Amino acid sequence: IVFRAAQKRSDIEIVGINDLLDAEYMAYMLKYDSTHGRFDGTVEVKDGHLVVNGKTIRVTAEKDPANLKWNEIGVDVVAEATGIFLTDETARKHITAGAKKVVLTGPSKDNTPMFVRGANFETYAGQDIVSNRSCTTNCLAPLAKVINDNFGIIEGLMTTVHATTATQKTVDGPSHKDWRGGRGAAQNIIPSSTGAAKAVGKVLPELNGKLTGMAFRVPTPNVSVVDLTVRLEKAASYEEIKKAIKAASEGPMKGVLGYTEDDVVSTDFNGEVCTSVFDAKAGIALNDNFVKLV
């Protein structure tokens, strides 16, 4: 998914991929995707490397990032997407190998700085290793910031109705740490934990301790929804809240926070470029201080 997204940008050039998979299989997985469809371009393998749209991309299969020799192919930024090297110490091996910066595509396991577009991205000060947090945090944080900046959040609860992930089971299987997580993904709505709401307090310190949440894993292949229920400091009608979110989506958060009043469903957001889209018709207010946002 990182590769497909990067290929659509003129300001990003992919020069290398490190994966333990065979190059032929990597090409196959890039060409065909059950959720996002066929790749819009040409994909070949030559001399053990990928050739995408006529451009050769170096393929390596190193277990230790320190041996990757990123300097030989002029790597500026590494997208660390293995889910393994999630600390500054381990991710720094990419720097040792010649890369200039590393972006972790998931939450770090230490105090690696975390940045989320639409939340605290403007505070980035050139750190060489950063975390982009999780997809849920990227969805929740921009919305929470708009609400807090305009109306103030006293406290809130978040529920994410989350699409199936690759770690789930197709049928019931052993899962010693998470018994419910071992149940068949296609047959169940599975309650689960998530640190996304608490993580918002790390990228928006003014909300630290004010939000928490949980997740439901549901049998859909892609697109998740965040249900944010908050108690407001400043009374506001639902129309006023919508107006503030729409203004942000057309102004400072354009391209990050979207806004829609259409009668949409989850598949309408497959391939969405915004990290968060506010569904104006799905939310509801109990009163001017207690509101559910979707």
Curated annotation (Swiss-Prot):
<feature type="binding site">
    <location>
        <position position="63"/>
    </location>
    <ligand>
        <name>NAD(+)</name>
    </ligand>
</feature>
<dbReference type="InterPro" id="IPR020828">
    <property type="entry name" value="GlycerAld_3-P_DH_NAD(P)-bd"/>
</dbReference>
<dbReference type="InterPro" id="IPR036291">
    <property type="entry name" value="NAD(P)-bd_dom_sf"/>
</dbReference>
<dbReference type="InterPro" id="IPR020831">
    <property type="entry name" value="GlycerAld/Erythrose_P_DH"/>
</dbReference>
<dbReference type="GO" id="GO:0006096">
    <property type="term" value="P:glycolytic process"/>
</dbReference>
<keyword id="KW-0520">NAD</keyword>
<comment type="function">
    <text>Catalyzes the oxidative phosphorylation of glyceraldehyde 3-phosphate (G3P) to 1,3-bisphosphoglycerate (BPG) using the cofactor NAD. The first reaction step involves the formation of a hemiacetal intermediate between G3P and a cysteine residue, and this hemiacetal intermediate is then oxidized to a thioester, with concomitant reduction of NAD to NADH. The reduced NADH is then exchanged with the second NAD, and the thioester is attacked by a nucleophilic inorganic phosphate to produce BPG.</text>
</comment>
<dbReference type="GO" id="GO:0006006">
    <property type="term" value="P:glucose metabolic process"/>
</dbReference>
<dbReference type="Pfam" id="PF02800">
    <property type="entry name" value="Gp_dh_C"/>
</dbReference>
<comment type="subunit">
    <text>Homotetramer.</text>
</comment>
<dbReference type="Pfam" id="PF00044">
    <property type="entry name" value="Gp_dh_N"/>
</dbReference>
<dbReference type="GO" id="GO:0050661">
    <property type="term" value="F:NADP binding"/>
</dbReference>
<feature type="binding site">
    <location>
        <position position="19"/>
    </location>
    <ligand>
        <name>NAD(+)</name>
    </ligand>
</feature>
<feature type="site" description="Activates thiol group during catalysis">
    <location>
        <position position="162"/>
    </location>
</feature>
<keyword id="KW-0324">Glycolysis</keyword>
<dbReference type="GO" id="GO:0005737">
    <property type="term" value="C:cytoplasm"/>
</dbReference>
<feature type="binding site">
    <location>
        <begin position="134"/>
        <end position="136"/>
    </location>
    <ligand>
        <name>D-glyceraldehyde 3-phosphate</name>
    </ligand>
</feature>
<dbReference type="InterPro" id="IPR020829">
    <property type="entry name" value="GlycerAld_3-P_DH_cat"/>
</dbReference>
<protein>
    <recommendedName>
        <fullName>Glyceraldehyde-3-phosphate dehydrogenase</fullName>
        <ecNumber>1.2.1.12</ecNumber>
    </recommendedName>
</protein>
<feature type="binding site">
    <location>
        <position position="217"/>
    </location>
    <ligand>
        <name>D-glyceraldehyde 3-phosphate</name>
    </ligand>
</feature>
<dbReference type="InterPro" id="IPR006424">
    <property type="entry name" value="Glyceraldehyde-3-P_DH_1"/>
</dbReference>
<feature type="active site" description="Nucleophile">
    <location>
        <position position="135"/>
    </location>
</feature>
<comment type="pathway">
    <text>Carbohydrate degradation; glycolysis; pyruvate from D-glyceraldehyde 3-phosphate: step 1/5.</text>
</comment>
<keyword id="KW-0963">Cytoplasm</keyword>
<comment type="similarity">
    <text>Belongs to the glyceraldehyde-3-phosphate dehydrogenase family.</text>
</comment>
<dbReference type="GO" id="GO:0004365">
    <property type="term" value="F:glyceraldehyde-3-phosphate dehydrogenase (NAD+) (phosphorylating) activity"/>
</dbReference>
<dbReference type="GO" id="GO:0051287">
    <property type="term" value="F:NAD binding"/>
</dbReference>
<feature type="binding site">
    <location>
        <position position="165"/>
    </location>
    <ligand>
        <name>D-glyceraldehyde 3-phosphate</name>
    </ligand>
</feature>
<keyword id="KW-0560">Oxidoreductase</keyword>
<feature type="binding site">
    <location>
        <begin position="194"/>
        <end position="195"/>
    </location>
    <ligand>
        <name>D-glyceraldehyde 3-phosphate</name>
    </ligand>
</feature>
<keyword id="KW-0547">Nucleotide-binding</keyword>
<feature type="binding site">
    <location>
        <position position="105"/>
    </location>
    <ligand>
        <name>NAD(+)</name>
    </ligand>
</feature>
